């Protein structure tokens, strides 16, 4: 059973419920795909996905994990008006890419992005998006 949330133990008698890694990535991709309909730029999500893909590369590269990410993306995208982008090349829509990278340099004022080129970040997250098992989508 794929869980959307996980419990994180903070102390012996305290824990918090938070999104699973797979759910976070699915939500971040949904947010990027939804930029056009919401007219919002999501540069932070590009960085967040890039960071998570870098930190958890081995785990996120597993076929079963990619399937979970795609299933969660499909589920969290229901009724969001982004069906036209829920396919392998959906992330390459020029307007989505433009909005994703809009004012990206201002992100450096908020967090240390280690001078990583935004285009390289977008390429990395696009490649992961391509690698999801889209042939399973009906």
Which stretches of residues belong to each language-model region?
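Structured mid-to-C-terminal alpha-helical surface segments
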Residues: 1-138
